């Protein structure tokens, strides 16, 4: 429906239509992989690919929502072009947060969720699967630090950018909450409820991060053209 609406409407630009088409392709792939997941008896690596596609779909939807709900209303523009340095920083931010999600799915997939019963470290336990579990924690910690760096840089340099400030505050707050929830989950003996909340907040972190990236890219790109 989204693809048909985008293609038939004159309200959407070429880029938005392309994103809608990519979203459609990803949804089809996700459906096919969903069947493969069942047929392979929930092989963890297939679920990992399935999750990656699902997160890509979410990212595309955030871009479309941004283009329709915000960019079309002409938000505050930054009166300078987007530099290569910021392009690298924002791209790396997206990759780092994506790695947090994928590493978390990897931990769940190999059954390593509850192997580390202490926080923030895993005691003196080493080797597989303890190292995989700790890798997820290290990546999450690095993501918090790097997101904090990007957020501080954006807010300091572009203090007049309302949407930029709101988006980075949301992303930073959510990833901080996510790490706290991870600790509570360990102390709460890996309650199914806490694990569900942990997963839900992880999705919100991804959405908020994509919003940070597209809001910054969108403002600069429109101004520099």
Residue ranges, per PLM feature:
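Polytopic transmembrane helical bundles with strong interfacial aromatic enrichment
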Residues: 1-225
């Amino acid at each position: 429906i989204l693809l048909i609406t985008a293609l038939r409407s004159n309200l959407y630009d070429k880029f938005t239509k392309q994103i809608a088409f990519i979203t459609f392709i990803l949804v089809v792939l996700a459906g096919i992989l969903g069947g493969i997941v069942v047929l392979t008896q929930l092989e963890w690596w297939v679920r990992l690919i399935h999750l990656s596609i699902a997160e890509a779909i979410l990212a595309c939807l955030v871009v479309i929502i941004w283009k329709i709900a915000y960019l079309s209303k002409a938000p505050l523009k930054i009166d300078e072009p987007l530099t290569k340095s910021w392009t690298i920083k924002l791209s790396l931010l997206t990759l780092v947060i994506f790695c947090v999600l994928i590493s978390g799915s990897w931990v769940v997939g190999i059954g390593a969720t509850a192997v580390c019963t202490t926080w923030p470290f895993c005691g003196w336990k080493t080797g597989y699967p303890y190292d995989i579990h700790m890798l997820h924690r290290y990546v999450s910690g690095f993501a918090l630090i790097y997101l904090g760096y990007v957020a501080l840089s954006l807010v300091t340099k572009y203090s007049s950018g309302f949407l930029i400030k709101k988006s980075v505050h949301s992303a930073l707050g959510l990833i901080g909450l996510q790490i706290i929830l991870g600790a509570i989950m360990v102390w709460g003996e890996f309650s199914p409820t806490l694990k569900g909340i942990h997963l839900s907040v992880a999705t919100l972190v991804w959405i908020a991060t994509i919003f940070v990236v597209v809001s910054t890219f969108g403002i600069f790109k429109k101004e520099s053209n």
